[in-house]
């Protein structure tokens, strides 16, 4: 039975996780498809560019990665302290690099909040702060983007990934090194 990601990822126990995303329908993530001869190597650039953006936005540090022909591996570190130390302005600035910020939050940030907007804006900023340190949101922002680009390029719709990403807690330095060597 599938467990909720919140039951699988506990930054208090360990901040390090090995995450894996795998393609479906014999789709190619990167490299050359021997059957069609089509080269998908440029997709690695998409992934690296997106990972660079996510490193600037999230408080999740990328320790290692490997991009294979039909899947990828990431070793990440959830930096909870960094998320907690961000100012409200920094949270909004980071969040707005990936998502639209409601006008109400912009008004609040500029000091022009209407009655009742301040509490709602502060609740949204608190939610965004949590999400900036959430592996599921990090992976969502990576996988959705890559799937849309690949589907657009392939001229198709539907799933690009084999389902939810896989994640494994890395409990000690030995495990961390083993994942990074892979």
Label every PLM stretch briefly.
Residues 1-182:
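Short catalytic/metal-binding and nucleic-acid-binding patches
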């Amino acid at each position: 039975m599938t467990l909720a990601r919140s039951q699988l990822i506990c930054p208090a126990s360990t901040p390090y996780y090995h995450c894996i995303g795998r393609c479906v329908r014999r789709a190619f993530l990167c490299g050359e498809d021997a059957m069609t001869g089509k080269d998908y190597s440029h997709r690695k650039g998409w992934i690296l560019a997106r990972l660079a953006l996510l490193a600037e936005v999230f408080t999740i540090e990328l320790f290692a990665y490997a991009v294979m022909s039909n899947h990828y591996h990431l070793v990440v570190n959830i930096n909870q302290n960094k998320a907690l130390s961000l100012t409200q302005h920094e949270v909004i600035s980071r969040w707005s690099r990936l998502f639209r910020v409601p006008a109400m939050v912009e008004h609040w940030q500029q000091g022009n909040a209407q009655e009742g907007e301040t509490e709602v804006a502060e609740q949204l900023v608190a939610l965004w702060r949590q999400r900036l340190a959430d592996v599921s949101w990090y992976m969502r922002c990576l996988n959705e983007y890559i799937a849309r680009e690949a589907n657009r390029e392939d001229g198709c719709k539907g799933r690009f990934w084999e389902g939810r990403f896989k994640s494994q807690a890395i409990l000690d330095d030995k495990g961390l090194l083993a994942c990074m060597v892979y």
